[in-house]
Swiss-Prot record:
Organism for this UniProt entry: Phocaeicola vulgatus (strain ATCC 8482 / DSM 1447 / JCM 5826 / CCUG 4940 / NBRC 14291 / NCTC 11154)
Catalytic reaction list: tRNA(Asn) + L-asparagine + ATP = L-asparaginyl-tRNA(Asn) + AMP + diphosphate + H(+)
Pfam families: tRNA-synt_2, tRNA_anti-codon
E.C. code: 6.1.1.22
Key words, A-Z: Aminoacyl-tRNA synthetase, ATP-binding, Cytoplasm, Ligase, Nucleotide-binding, Protein biosynthesis
Family note: Belongs to the class-II aminoacyl-tRNA synthetase family.
Gene Ontology terms, MF aspect: asparagine-tRNA ligase activity; ATP binding; nucleic acid binding
UniProt KW Chaperone keyword: no
UniProt-recorded name of the protein: Asparagine--tRNA ligase
Keyword ATP-binding in annotation: yes
Subunit structure: Homodimer.
GO CC, any one term: cytoplasm
GO biological process: asparaginyl-tRNA aminoacylation
């Protein structure tokens, strides 16, 4: 076959130089036709849209054509022509076809509907479906938007360690990292494992957050963000939890809680606008196939100012809802860590727009959050979204050395793990704020998917680490 430079299908479908000879490569989605002419729907992953290849059967070897089945990979030389059918403006009249890879008849992605559960079992193949092709192209574009947003605002991208000795959230649900022989663990007289002879000379884990290290950078570089994988060993088999996921964590020197809320709202709106501007075909496909209100919901976020609501006021609204007969599975009272059903009631039923909940009780939030003058609450903020619940968690950080030290001692956090963090309050402490956004939570909102396992290529969940 004549050598012609390949054109990606996303670019080919925009061309109008009909009569030009082109080359496309991709995977066969469908093949149909008559005894004289076949029509092949070809996709190369660059777009949700297929290009139609028109094949005059008289011009091609019958044995070669038998190899062109759903899933086969082919290279096509042909003439770009104006399509007479509806759906797209251009198609390719095949002049030469090369089969690059045949597809066994056990190929599981045939032309029929597949359940999400089934597709999770074949995660190595599901990017070839329309749905997951769309999701993963959107995922790429959201990552680009994140870097672009922060770069345009003078933030520095800061890399924090994956292996750490600190537990930022204090949850203790961390994956251990060790080179020790698990069948011959040395223990002290109290039964605790001795790590002195381990690789790092101490107990080490996979990070649950890059925040603490990010704070160190913010107190030197001014404004930074992290974007990387994090790990939580929570035994939670829900549509909202993963053991391995990606986090975006900006930290900004001299920002107070109001600045932090402004940044969070601007950031989310930027990402949503980017999706609509750069991934519209994919978003439209997901809107039409799975969630008829997706585009309307995305556009609604851009139009509305986020409600800013103190936790105490939120509790009052929820208590009033209970009095009026609304049934919650979990109880509502001041001091409770709100469940997803509470968050979604505030967003979806009461305000009908995103809510930033602030000033949470000190006892249900992390040690590093700045305490309010009432002594009971901290300058925390959670951004709550429709269908998702919490999408961002953040706070103004405690900048006072003595208050931070007292809180660390109250919670029994070992000083040997925190001395370096306290140094930032000892040497030129400054007000600063930040937040964490779960990348996959953002993707749930932008794609309309209902299970977080469907917005990451290879989900890691309890008892599941395939591929």
């Amino acid at each position: 076959m004549e050598k012609i430079s390949r054109t990606k299908i996303v670019d080919l479908l925009k061309r109008r130089d009909f009569g030009a000879m082109v080359n496309v490569k991709g995977w066969v989605r469908t093949r149909r036709g008559s005894k004289q002419v076949n029509f092949i729907a070809l996709n190369d992953g660059s777009t949700i849209n297929n290009v139609q290849i028109v094949v005059d059967l008289a011009n091609f070897d019958e044995e070669m054509l038998k190899q062109i089945t759903t899933g086969a990979c082919i290279s096509v030389n042909g003439e770009l022509t104006e399509s007479i059918g509806s759906g797209q403006a251009a198609e390719v009249q095949a002049r030469g076809i090369e089969v690059l890879g045949t597809c066994d008849n056990t190929y599981p992605l045939q032309k029929k509907g597949h359940t999400m559960e089934f597709l999770r079992e074949i995660a190595h193949l599901r990017p070839r479906t329309n749905t997951f092709g769309a999701v993963f192209r959107i995922r790429h574009n959201m990552a680009i938007a994140i870097h672009k947003f922060f770069h345009e605002r003078g933030f520095f991208y800061f890399h924090t360690p994956i292996i750490t000795a600190s537990d930022c959230e204090g949850a203790g649900q961390m994956f251990q990292v060790t080179t020790k022989n698990l069948y011959d663990l040395k223990k002290d007289e109290n039964g605790a494992i001795i790590y002195d002879d381990d690789f790092f000379g101490k107990q080490a884990s996979l990070t649950v957050s890059g925040q603490l290290e990010g704070e160190l950078a913010a107190t030197a570089l001014g404004a930074i963000y992290t974007f990387g994988p994090t790990f939580r060993a929570e035994n939670s088999n829900t549509p909202r939890h993963l053991a391995e996921f990606w986090m975006i964590e900006p930290e900004v020197a001299f920002n107070d809680i109001t600045d932090n809320m402004d940044l969070a709202e601007d950031f989310i709106k930027y990402c949503v606008q980017w999706a609509l501007d750069n991934c519209y075909d994919d978003v439209k496909f997901l809107n039409d196939m799975f969630d008829k209100g997706l585009i309307e919901r995305l556009q609604g976020v851009l139009k509305e100012e986020f409600v800013r609501l103190p936790y105490t006021e939120g509790i009052k609204i929820l208590e009033e809802a209970v009095v009026k007969g609304h049934k919650f599975e979990f109880p509502v009272y001041w001091g409770v860590d709100l469940a997803s059903e509470h968050e979604r009631y505030l967003v979806e039923e009461h305000f009908k727009r995103p809510v930033i909940l602030t000033d949470y009780p000190k006892e249900i939030k992390a040690f590093y959050m700045k305490q309010n003058e009432d002594g009971k609450t901290v300058r925390a903020m959670d951004v709550l979204f429709p269908k998702i619940g919490e999408i961002i968690g953040g706070s103004e950080r405690e900048a006072d050395y003595d208050k931070l030290m007292t809180r660390i001692q109250e919670l029994g956090i070992p000083m040997k793990d925190m001395w370096w963090y306290l140094d930032t309050r000892k040497f030129g402490s400054c007000p600063h704020s930040g937040f964490g956004l779960g990348f996959e939570r953002l993707l749930l909102f932008v794609t309309g998917m209902t299970n977080i396992r469907d917005v990451i290529p290879f989900p890691r969940t309890p008892r599941n680490a395939e591929f």
